[in-house]
Each structure stands twice: as C-alpha cells, then as structure tokens.
Amino acid sequence: MTLLDSDSRQSAEVLPAAGPAPDRPRTYQVRTFGCQMNMHDSERIAGLLEAAGYVRAADDEPADVVVFNTCAVRENADNRLYGNLGLLLPVKKAKPDMQIAVGGCLAQKDKGDIVRRAPWVDVVFGTHNIEALPVLLERARIAREAQVEIREALEVFPSTLPSRRESVYAAWVAISVGCNNTCTFCIVPSLRGRERDRRPGDILREIQTLVADGVLEVTLLGQNVNSYGVDFGDRQAFAKLLRACGTIDGLERVRFTSPHPRDFTDDVIAAMAETPNVMPQLHMPLQSGSDAVLRRMRRSYRKEKYLDIISRVRSAIPDAAITTDIIVGFPGETEDDFAETLDVVRKARFAGAFTFQYSKRPGTPAAEMPDQVPPDVVADRFARLVALVEQIALEENQAQVGRVVEVLVAEGEGRKDAETHRMSGRAPDNRLVHFRATDARPGDVVTVAVTQAAPHCLIADQVLGVRRTRAGDAWEARRSVRPSGVLLGMPALRPRT
C-alpha cells in the first residue's frame, strides 16, 4: 500500500485506461452517497474517467471500475460503504481485473483504514485530489497493490475538471468549497477544509457555457453560500453573484444551497426578490429551535433571529417555499428544548424539512458531550416532529390547489410515473409536481393547474400547455447519441516530477 501526503508532487496527468481486452474500453460506475456537493464531485469523477478513455457501464452489466464517492456526516455512512464493499467482494473474486476506488469525505477521514478493513479496495483518494483518480487506478493496476493518496489541502478546484453531467437541463455549480464554521456536530470542515471561493468571473463563465449546452437551471453550491466572498474580501459578493446570474440570456432558473442564518443579510433577500430568474425558494437549516441547544451546537444565531429572517424573506417574496434541516436528540436536549423546535416549525410553516436523529460522529466536539439523549427518547421525538412537519407540509401544499404553475420536466423524479401515466418535474418554488403525461420531454416546460396535494408533492391533472425548449432538444440529442463526456474547463494539472 502506498500512502502519499500533501507534500507529494506526483503527476495528475490523465492516462489512457488499460484493460484486459484491447478491443474494449474499460467501463466505470460511480456510486454517490451524501450531499449535493458530492453529486457535483461525482460528475467530475465521471468526466475524468471518460477523458481517460473509460465508458459508462450499462445498468445491467458489472463495471470494470466502481467508484464510491462517500459521505461522513452520519454513522450509517460507514455502514453503507462497508456493506456495499462487502457485496462487491465475490464479484471481484470472479472478475480479478475489476478495480474498486473509494473517495469523498469518509475516505478523507479514514484514509488507509479503508484498505485495512476492505483489502480488496484498489484506490483511496480524498476530497482534495479527485483529479488524481485516473493515475491512481493505473498505478494500482500496474503495481498490483492498493494506492492511498490523501492530501490535506485543495490544489485543483473540482469545477475546473471535465464533467459528465447527469442532467442536460439542470446543473450544479460550485461557488466555494470548505467551511469556516465550527458546528460541534459536524465533521465536514475538517474533511473539506476552510472555505475557498471561486472568482465571480469564473463562475459566470461556467454558467454561460452550461446555458450554451442547453441548461435552463443552475443550483449554486457551497457549504455556506452566503458567506461567499470572504476569501477575497467582499461581503456582498453573493448578492452580486445572484444579480449577475439574472443577466445571463437563456438561464431561466437559479437556485442555491445551503445558506447559514448567521450570514443571511438583507442584500441577499433583495437580490432574490429583484432578480427574476432567482426562484422563490429557500432552504435554510434550522437544526434546533432551542437557544440552549443552538449554543451547544455553536450555531451562532438564535431562534428569534431565524424567525426574523423567515419573516423578511416572506415579506419580500410572498410565494417563497421555505424548507429546512432539523436535528433531534442533540446531547443535552430536554423536552422543553424539543418543544421550542416544534414551536419554530409551527411558526415558520416549512414547505418541507429534512429531519435527522442525532448521530454521534467521532472527532466532533458533540461526540464527547455529556447528557447524550437515550435512543428511545430520540425516536419518540423524531416521530412527533415528522408528524408535525408532514401535517404542515400537507396544509401548505393544499393551499396550492387551483394555482397555475410552470413545471420544468424532469427525468426520474417520479418513481410511479409509469404506472400512474404521469410525468414529473419541479415548480419554480421547487415543489415536486406529478402531471398527466404529455409529449413533453425532460427539459421542456409545461404549464399545469394543480388539482391535488400530498405532503411531499402536488398533482396536476390539467395540462394547459407545453413549451419545447433547447434543453429538451439537448436531452433528445443525448438520448440518440450518448456523448463520451462534457468538458466545462481544462483540468489544471500538475507537471510530472
């Protein structure tokens, strides 16, 4: 096993894929766990592999290379990875030339321990060096030993790498990586590093390239998007970036995730309200409604500030759909603390919430805190929270019945579309809408009247119109001729030493 640290300067040049059959390129599959940033990075991993000569494996065939892009936020992330690795062991025994690579946050955290626990893994790479993957795969193949390379600092911004996007009509655009916050439950800053911001011009050029390729919607990504600009000393940079997105011809929808309440300022609210293609949607993590718990979480805002932001957003954008993240059972949480969380949920009237039972993560301050809440108490509170969230989400969705909305048709959003003879997509406020099937293509825009509501979706049995778009044209073109990769920039590669 080879372990390379952040001082290593080996080449990251893209090498051709080698395989047992010279007449057949090696195939790959990328499996992604975790957040939107991981989805973004997985598209870059796929782009790197395709630039190196690999081709995407068909769904019904075992891949020559399987890459896991992992998450480390919750305890079950470990179990999920090692469970999947265990399932691949007999496959690899039957197919010795198969290679398995593990990247992402869990790889950054566990490093060589992954190979010790699963010695059939060929490559381990971290969050700071995804550009090295093709070289590491080739080196592992030639050396017949695992290659473990973890760096402690980012050298190549992932957004400059080749990309194989999953969607032709919507795209992730990273505006920053890393995080300067120190939430006591979160391990991400230690794995992704401190915040580093891309320059606005680079971001806007990437978006313009995406739009030229047919994209209608972009989602701006960062661990804390509204602290964007701290790296180059402009506290209003995020609001300026939103307004600049409004000047790009052909860009119909702009979203962003995730902001931090501490940095949510009036200039951002004004930019959201005054930029027509910034969608009336906000996902802003609450985590807890108790000031005492927020203090222990080191969240640097309190209940009333959070509710005040919600009020100001709704005053400027009355139709905004607001969603959130909530953790139940944080160490020391009392029944009174939990009641404060329920109170915020009732007052904020979220359109939806991602709810989590607190998961102890080794290496975080919260893992060492006293007064860990018993699992049965956590489970009871979690069930009560979910029931309230779903009740309010249903009521908020029922208020949408009768409204006419434009839906960007999506691919794969509705699991039951085939049996219900419906298609699915997203309204401007990001609500999921299932509508009566038409000849619309993914990427087209349909105008529908909402006829029914459920906690997690809207149903529209009345389709009023279909607008064919260049995004739909791009989807149709990709379906007929599957491209080998989509380049959004030239890789910034280090020379061989």
UniProtKB/Swiss-Prot annotation:
Domain named TRAM: which ranges?
A: 398-464
Give the GO molecular function terms.
Answer: 4 iron, 4 sulfur cluster binding; metal ion binding; N6-isopentenyladenosine methylthiotransferase activity
Q: Where in or outside the cell?
A: Cytoplasm
Positions of the UniProt region annotated as Disordered: 1-26
Q: Which UniProt keywords apply?
A: 4Fe-4S, Cytoplasm, Iron, Iron-sulfur, Metal-binding, S-adenosyl-L-methionine, Transferase, tRNA processing
Catalytic reaction annotation: N(6)-dimethylallyladenosine(37) in tRNA + (sulfur carrier)-SH + AH2 + 2 S-adenosyl-L-methionine = 2-methylsulfanyl-N(6)-dimethylallyladenosine(37) in tRNA + (sulfur carrier)-H + 5'-deoxyadenosine + L-methionine + A + S-adenosyl-L-homocysteine + 2 H(+)
Write down the required cofactor(s).
Answer: [4Fe-4S] cluster
| UniProt cross-references to Gene3D superfamilies, sorted A to Z | Methylthiotransferase, N-terminal domain (3.40.50.12160), tm_1862 like domain (3.80.30.20)
Which residues does the annotation say bind [4Fe-4S] cluster 1? C35, C71, C105
Please note every region of biased composition (Basic and acidic residues). Answer: 1-10
Q: Ranges for the Radical SAM core domain?
A: 165-395
Q: Which GO terms describe its cellular component?
A: cytosol
Residue stretches making up the MTTase N-terminal domain: 26-142
rRNA-binding as a keyword of this entry, yes or no, is: no
Q: Does the keyword S-adenosyl-L-methionine apply?
A: yes
Q: Which InterPro entries match?
A: Elp3/MiaA/NifB-like_rSAM (IPR006638), Methylthiotransferase (IPR005839), Methylthiotransferase_CS (IPR020612), Methylthiotransferase_N (IPR013848), Methylthiotransferase_N_sf (IPR038135), MiaB_methiolase (IPR006463), rSAM (IPR007197), rSAM_horseshoe (IPR023404)
The record's remark on the cofactor is: Binds 2 [4Fe-4S] clusters. One cluster is coordinated with 3 cysteines and an exchangeable S-adenosyl-L-methionine.
Under the heading CDD domains, the entry gives: Radical_SAM
Give the principal location in a single coarse category.
cytoplasm
Which positions are annotated as binding [4Fe-4S] cluster 2? C179, C183, C186
Domain of life from the UniProt record = Bacteria
Q: How does it assemble?
A: Monomer.
Q: What does this protein do, in the record's words? A: Catalyzes the methylthiolation of N6-(dimethylallyl)adenosine (i(6)A), leading to the formation of 2-methylthio-N6-(dimethylallyl)adenosine (ms(2)i(6)A) at position 37 in tRNAs that read codons beginning with uridine.
Checking PANTHER family in the record gives: CDK5 REGULATORY SUBUNIT-ASSOCIATED PROTEIN 1, MITOCHONDRIAL TRNA METHYLTHIOTRANSFERASE CDK5RAP1
Q: What is the protein name for this chain?
A: tRNA-2-methylthio-N(6)-dimethylallyladenosine synthase
Species of origin reads Acidothermus cellulolyticus (strain ATCC 43068 / DSM 8971 / 11B)
Whichever gene encodes this chain, its name is miaB
